[in-house]
Amino acid sequence: MKRSQGFNFHYQAHGYHPFLCYDGLTGDLIKAKLRDGTLHCSNGADKFRESIFQEYLERGIKTYLRGDSGFSSPKLYETCESNGCSYAIRLKQNPALIALASDKEEDLYQATQKDQISYAVTYGEFMYQAGSWKYPRRVVFKIEKPYGQLTHMYTFIVTNMDMEPYQIIQFYCGRGNPFRKIYHIQTV
């Protein structure tokens, strides 16, 4: 790495962007790789995961992946699919996704028309093909109306799992546990 590359002048230190992979059941760290802080999240994620997939496939162990929108890339989806890995990866909200979820948004609006204070939620799914994808994939979504707010919040997840949309959202939300460990690593 070049001397000035990845240097954060605000913190007066070099930034690093590690890959960390945790076991979803035990919380154990499976693999880590320190990377330059100037790299995008998804850059090389497919290759990082491939060796893990191979090791687990040889042992006959089923693999699952949850990832935030920073890891959303066709290369990673394809690596998961070709290695038998079930995945749930968040997509960044965009107008095309919102338009495809508009029927359920209308249902949520109708359901809360007489009570716009309480919390409300709806789930759905559709097939979607982004411009960089070779073929359509299943996208599940959640639309929430938070308590005391009139606006809606969206969650879009691309997946190859066969579960109900709400179950996939629950599975995806389990990714928060490793983030507590990552925070701990950063503060040590």
Where are these regions (language model features)?
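Short, conserved catalytic/metal-binding motifs centered on acidic residues
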Residues: 1, 27, 64-72, 87, ...
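An anionic, glycine-rich sequence signature occurring as long contiguous blocks
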Residues: 86-187
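Short, surface-exposed basic-aromatic patches at helix termini and helix-loop junctions that form
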Residues: 57, 77-86
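Active-site beta-loop-alpha junctions of metal-dependent nucleic acid enzymes
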Residues: 33-55
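Active-site-proximal, Lys/Arg-enriched surface segment
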Residues: 1-20
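A short acidic (Asp/Glu
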Residues: 73-78, 98-102
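Active-site beta-loop-alpha junctions enriched in small/polar residues
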Residues: 35-37, 68-70, 92-94
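Gly-rich Lys/Arg/Thr-decorated short loops/hinges at beta-loop-alpha junctions or inter-strand turns
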Residues: 24-36
